[in-house]
Amino acid sequence: GTLITPENARKIKEAGVQRCSISIDGYNAEKHDAFRCVPGAFDATMRGIECLKAEGVEFQINTTVTRDNLHDFKKIFELCERIGAAAWHIFLLVPMGRAAELADQVITAQEYEDVLHWFYDFRKTTSMHLKATCAPHYYRIMRQRAREEGVSVTPATFGMDAMTRGCLGGTGFCFISHVGQVQPCGYLTLDCGNV
């Protein structure tokens, strides 16, 4: 979102882009900028979002779950709602690639369970589309909680989540790198050819 200007937003709209993904990893400038290691990133992101909104382009917020922002999740959720995000996608930190340097930010197994239960509860309170990425265990939690609540897991009650069964890498999508290498997922460096 930091590079979106009024001109870029207009071009995005003219190109027919239906939704842009914007990363926000903290509910305020101090928290977000510290994670991104870029002073001013939060404010620039907010300006970019306003440019998209002015052009009528939907946006979703992507948030990486880390030790540093775990306890701020309700505040990040509230920020997403306040700024008018169409969706909030959380990404469980996979310490691969550049994220290998963030291994100390990986949360515990119990914290993952807790955050995914919170996420399940959040989805009941909002019209935003919520999606947990790199979190196949969310779908276990969703089914367990729905069963406890007497709710059938169908597309009518859970949308596309009703049809998702675990990791989609290599089955529901693939990753193509900047040099054309095809992989089942950006985190699984299995060479499947080159475009």
Write out the residue ranges for each language-model feature.
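Glycine-rich, flexible loop/turn motifs
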Residues: 31, 38, 98, 103, ...
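Flexible glycine/acidic-rich beta-alpha junction loops that bind and position SAM and/or redox cofactors
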Residues: 68, 87-107, 129-147
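A structural motif corresponding to the C-terminal lobe/cap of the Radical SAM core domain
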Residues: 82, 101-127, 189
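Radical SAM/AdoMet-radical enzyme domain recognition
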Residues: 1-95
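Structured helix-beta-strand junction loops
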Residues: 15, 55, 125-126, 170
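Residue-level preference for long, well-ordered alpha-helices that form the structural scaffold
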Residues: 38-41, 69, 104, 108-112, ...
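Generic structural signal for nonpolar/small residues that stabilize regular secondary structure
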Residues: 61, 80, 88, 119, ...
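Accessory C-terminal segments flanking Radical SAM cores
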Residues: 95, 135-195
